Amino acid sequence: MNTKLILFITRVAVGWIMLYAGLTKLVNPNWSAAGYLGNAKTFAGFYNWFLQPEILPFTNFMNEWGLTLLGISLIAGAFIKYSGYLGALLMLLYYFPVLDFPKIGANSYLVDDHIIYALVLVLFSVYRAGEYWGLDGWRKSKYGN
């Protein structure tokens, strides 16, 4: 199978996962990041800062729209150079609260789904996956770099 096709299929699949995760948060008026952040095991002080009443609405907004826009970007193949790195950062921010450092999780989850997503998103940026059947490719063919 062709490398470009694999990048395209993987980009759209990961995009769908991110879009779905964002939309389910957007349409649920009761959704909040508070439960996830409040249970942070690593860097608890950092994550508890996001729980402050004046900051939590912004945290929720950034989660909902960050995932939704990341999904749209990946599916459309638009701005992948940037959204891949920003998405990887978001995945790392999701990773640390569940990590009970220096202990490894019950099922050896030192590497969990967030790390895999982060690595895949970085690969999308490095290999400019949006240039393959995406708006980045269209923009490049029409306007150059």
Name the predicted role of every residue range.
Residues M1-G38, T42-L69, A76-N145:
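Extended, low-polarity transmembrane helix blocks
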